[in-house]
Amino acid sequence: MGGMAKKKHEKGAGSTPATVQLEKAGVPFKTYEYAHSNDHMDDGYGVEAATKLGFDEHQVFKTLMADTGSERVVGVVPVSGHMDLKALAAAVGAKKAAMADPKVAMRESGYVVGGISPLGQRPHHKTVLDESALQYDEILLSGGKRGFSVGVNPNDLLKVLDAVAAPIGTW
């Protein structure tokens, strides 16, 4: 056992910067773990999570990082869709946005691709959640590593991230 005390949360849950941020904010959340494999990589990590955890793909969200030219911003959209970069730029008051290089996204977020969470990033980035999330009591997103998701109320997520909701998802 290490010298750091762990706060108690759902059985089997690992501690990541994402779960630490939720705990510190007092936000209720659930953790979901699944065996990550490379079999789903044509579909993406989020589709794998939805399939293995038995959730609708519209209720499971992926975290994508974009570059507006002056800053990096985070978009959180359903795994079943894509991110509208023009809409993301508009939501943060920028003229345009382009997808960040995966290596940049890993360095800027502190997470590996397939495990990037909008929570617990260092430094914090402006975050936009697709407004479709607001129809659910719980959405799933990466908990900070592959095979580990957190379930959280989208309104709680907006508050803890100081994020905005906007129509940034496309299907």
Task: Describe the role of every protein-language-model region.
Residues 2-171:
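Extended, low-hydrophobicity, polar/charged segments
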